[in-house]
């Protein structure tokens, strides 16, 4: 089942962030309507009970569309909600520990920002690596991010991570997503570009079309 799930890890990877004015479920529905193939719940300040309820409903929405639902940081919530997997940061549980909670069929991804972190993710058994920031980003995390890596840095990361797929993140917009696809990223992740859009469904659709443009259909 994990291989089948990984085969669907492609295209627009929409991240639902707690800083949006829209409700998480409204954003999930909009992203799916726009053609997102992967949705991540990144609700770091949500109480566990609230996150679980949102995850359960999000899983149901994603199943209808054939999309993947991943939970940020919380393999326990991901397992209880029957999500497709989890995305981990550098300071979260190691991939092996997350997989003990989730079981063998779930996807485990991890954020990376350097060659050393990519190598460590591969050695730890991650299923994919998130890499960035590719461009300057409007989204803020708890830890300071390294400087933008650019398309050249992304291309190097794709080569370094192989055979693991790479999810590019950081400042990616409709205008730049085709470059990201051509650099070899399996997915283009976005937070502010989608969550802050006046019409998130339309913006997601534009990004999905641009990702597969220029002969880069997947």
For every predicted segment, state its role:
Residues 139-143:
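Glycine/threonine-rich flexible loop motifs
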Residues 1-92, 100-128, 146-152, 156, ...:
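Conserved N-terminal beta1-alpha1 strand-loop-helix module at the mouth
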